């Protein structure tokens, strides 16, 4: 990165820090104008993780909170809205919390974490403990919000449920102005509770907390909540009639989470890496919120931060590496029926599927059926929508190369689990390989291909398609005890796919995998064997004492394969 260029804000979610420390910032302050003009008392934005939700919440806090520093907004879109700035900038007490850290293996641990989050926020307003505008009993209640013992907040359960409402009422009373409430990652406590078995207790706590502060609260100017999922009204928003939910299918605010194509081109140009545009678009674009197509901000920023110093950098999986990806693993495991398996194959091939989407699920029902899982995949960013059929059913697709590669990785991972469970078939396949029984290798490998989800991706080059079948073979061979397996290592005059040394028997295997364009399996097999001979791949095995070496040319096309073998012995 050149001296004088703005730094890239990798992992920074503080608007104030980004502006104060001169980081590169893509202007999303137009969201402030829309919030005020389109006005809803309670706004819930649901977007996948790493799409700028927390940064936007930080931006809202910086704009509305009393004591706002106007210089933070100089040169930004909202600064041109002089009347809005005059009436709203720095005019409100703001309660701003993130529930991202509210988790634990038990309800007690999680509720203690919630006390900590709310207690620390209440600590930001120490003047309330001496405010002459509060009654003595109210000042005592405020003190109870911030009291600690041995480093832990001690507020009672009934006060915890009332805590946000109570704090908003005290702030409004002290300042004579209504309060703006910002709750980031509102659904994380429910997600963690579902994982660890105390879901009903957490639902009851969050429902009470939210209803008290959001429903008929005279001290509330408006509230903004963000999260990944829209949780059913019947679950935690019971009786809340003023809730405006803005999901990935809504056109309102469509460009304020994620980077637009123009914004990405400007960023690449600023850092003099416009030549990376094609790769960035293929790997990180493709998400559709409302009618807007956007890039994942996390991916773009991470890639650019490394690409400026490495012109040969190939796109990496940044977004998918920030999660356990348990959702996609469950999805692949649930593809038991032939219909669902063919649907996954269609998605990986770049096609769209029409599915009815439910945006108001509960965590208890997320994994009840494959139909619910489609909705979850859309909400969490593993799939995106390409338009609607009737307002309830949407055209779903994998957004980009990054997520497509994640699907492939999980498909191979599931395949390996299945191979490990079927020891009898594994033994038969390996026995056929080490004896040069090409017809049996072909039959068993075809069975394996039929068992797994096939890859017929029209968007990638042939070597990438070959890598998938290569991965299947490695997934099989990796479980064979006593076999030393090497993959894609440099040989005397080039690279070969797979080398296997069976030390106890002085047998070696050389396997070259080819993807058969247009299904020309015989021709692809011959090319594979010819490559093994011409590139002298067998030299390493001879040097290591193998006296029998089988050369395998394996050609694949979707769920078909052809196997040819040549034997050398001395």
Spans of model-derived segments:
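Domain-level recognition of nuclease-like catalytic cores that cleave nucleotide substrates
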Residues: 540, 544-570
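Walker A/P-loop-proximal flanking segment of P-loop NTPase domains
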Residues: 1-81
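Structural recognition of the conserved hydrophobic beta-strand(s) that form the central parallel beta-sheet
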Residues: 180-184, 208, 221-228
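P-loop NTPase motor core
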Residues: 11, 62-127
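Conserved P-loop NTPase mechanochemical-coupling segment
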Residues: 10-19, 109, 113-161, 189-194
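Amphipathic alpha-helical segments of the small helical/lid subdomains adjacent to P-loop NTPase cores
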Residues: 233-239, 246-305, 309, 343-347
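Substrate-engagement module of ASCE P-loop NTPases
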Residues: 122, 163-174, 201-221, 537-540
């Amino acid at each position: 990165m050149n001296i004088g260029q703005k730094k890239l804000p990798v992992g920074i979610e503080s608007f104030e820090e980004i502006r104060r420390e001169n980081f590169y910032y893509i202007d999303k302050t137009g969201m402030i104008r829309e919030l005020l003009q389109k006005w809803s008392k309670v706004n819930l934005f649901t977007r996948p993780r790493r799409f700028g939700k927390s940064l936007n919440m930080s931006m809202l806090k910086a704009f509305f909170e009393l004591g706002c520093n106007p210089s933070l907004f100089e040169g930004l879109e909202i600064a041109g809205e002089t009347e809005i700035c005059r009436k709203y900038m720095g005019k409100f007490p703001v309660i701003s919390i993130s529930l991202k850290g509210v988790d634990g293996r038990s309800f007690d641990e999680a509720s203690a974490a919630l006390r900590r989050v709310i207690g620390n926020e209440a600590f930001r307003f120490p003047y309330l403990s001496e405010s002459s505008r509060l009654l003595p009993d109210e000042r005592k209640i405020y003190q109870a919000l911030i009291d600690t013992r041995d480093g832990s907040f001690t507020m009672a359960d009934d006060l915890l449920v009332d805590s946000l409402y109570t704090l908003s009422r005290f702030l409004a009373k002290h300042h004579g102005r209504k309060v703006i409430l910002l709750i980031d990652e509102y659904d994380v406590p429910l997600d963690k509770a579902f994982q660890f078995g105390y879901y009903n207790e957490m639902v009851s706590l969050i429902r009470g907390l939210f209803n008290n502060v959001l429903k008929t609260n005279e001290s509330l100017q408006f509230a903004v909540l963000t999260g990944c999922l829209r949780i059913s009204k019947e679950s935690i928003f019971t009786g809340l009639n003023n809730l405006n939910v803005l999901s990935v299918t809504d056109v309102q605010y469509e460009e304020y989470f994620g980077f637009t194509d123009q914004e990405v081109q400007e960023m690449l140009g600023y850092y003099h890496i416009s030549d990376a545009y094609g790769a960035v678009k293929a790997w990180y674009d493709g998400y559709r919120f409302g009618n807007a197509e956007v890039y994942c901000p996390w991916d773009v920023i991470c890639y650019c931060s490394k690409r400026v110093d490495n012109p040969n950098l190939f796109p990496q999986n940044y977004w998918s590496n920030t999660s356990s990806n348990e959702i996609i693993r469950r999805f692949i495991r649930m593809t038991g029926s032939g219909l669902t398996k063919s649907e996954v194959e269609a998605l990986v091939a770049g096609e769209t599927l029409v599915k009815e989407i439910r945006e108001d699920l509960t965590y208890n029902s997320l994994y009840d059926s494959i139909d619910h899982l489609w909705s979850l995949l859309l909400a969490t960013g593993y799939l995106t929508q390409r338009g609607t059929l009737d307002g309830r059913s949407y055209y779903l697709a994998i957004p980009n190369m990054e997520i497509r590669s994640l699907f492939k990785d999980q498909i191979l991972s599931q395949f390996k689990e299945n191979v490990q469970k079927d020891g009898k078939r594994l033994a038969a396949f390996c026995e056929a390989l080490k004896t040069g029984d090409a017809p049996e290798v072909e039959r068993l490998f075809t069975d394996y291909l039929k068992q797994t989800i096939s890859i017929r991706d029209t968007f990638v080059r042939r070597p990438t398609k070959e890598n998938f079948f290569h991965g299947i073979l490695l997934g099989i061979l990796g479980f064979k005890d006593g076999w030393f397996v090497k993959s894609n290592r440099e040989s005397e005059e080039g690279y070969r796919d797979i080398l296997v040394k069976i030390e106890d028997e002085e047998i070696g295997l050389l396997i070259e995998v080819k993807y058969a364009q247009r299904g020309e399996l015989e021709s692809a097999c011959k090319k594979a064997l010819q490559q093994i001979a011409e590139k002298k791949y067998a030299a390493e095995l001879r040097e290591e004492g193998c006296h029998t070496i089988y050369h395998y040319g394996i050609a694949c096309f979707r769920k078909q394969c052809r196997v040819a073998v040549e034997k050398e012995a001395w």
